[in-house]
């Protein structure tokens, strides 16, 4: 199966913004980051938002905020980047890997449903290569 990926869409405006950020001396937690956090919070109709350096950091923070840790299980797709499973290990929980459905890049939802136990505290679905999981099906199962 050939999965097409698109090249980055970076134009002159994005390049100028990067140059301006580099010239500002602030490339992480400076005023541009704080302004972005305010704008994204407003866009999401919430009081606060926080910028993180990666989806990996975001997933680990989310698991910690949910109180997930030793003794807990978190279900995720076996077909994913290692970070998805490693953040589960970082918080002390046990990853439960679900194979993809035959002919698909999505988790096998029947196997996912059968893997849920009293120790299951979360499911981390994986959208891959532009293919979005069937979240209605996942919500219907949980």
Residue ranges of model-derived segments:
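PLP-dependent aminotransferase-like
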Residues: 64-141
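N-terminal "arm"/small-domain region of PLP-dependent enzymes with the aminotransferase-like
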Residues: 1-27, 31
């Amino acid at each position: 199966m050939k999965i097409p990926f698109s090249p980055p869409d970076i134009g002159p405006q994005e390049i100028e913004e990067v140059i301006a950020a580099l010239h500002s001396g602030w490339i992480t937690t400076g005023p541009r980051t704080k302004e972005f956090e305010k704008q994204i919070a407003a866009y999401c109709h919430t009081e606060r938002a926080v910028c993180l350096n990666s989806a990996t950091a975001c997933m680990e923070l989310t698991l910690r905020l949910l109180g997930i840790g030793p003794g807990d299980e978190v279900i995720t797709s076996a077909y994913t980047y290692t970070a998805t499973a490693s953040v589960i290990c970082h918080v002390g929980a046990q990853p439960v890997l679900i194979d993809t459905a035959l002919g698909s890049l999505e988790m096998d939802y029947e196997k996912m449903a059968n893997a849920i136990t009293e120790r299951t505290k979360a499911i981390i679905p994986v959208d891959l290569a532009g293919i979005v999981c069937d979240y209605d099906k996942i919500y219907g199962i949980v």
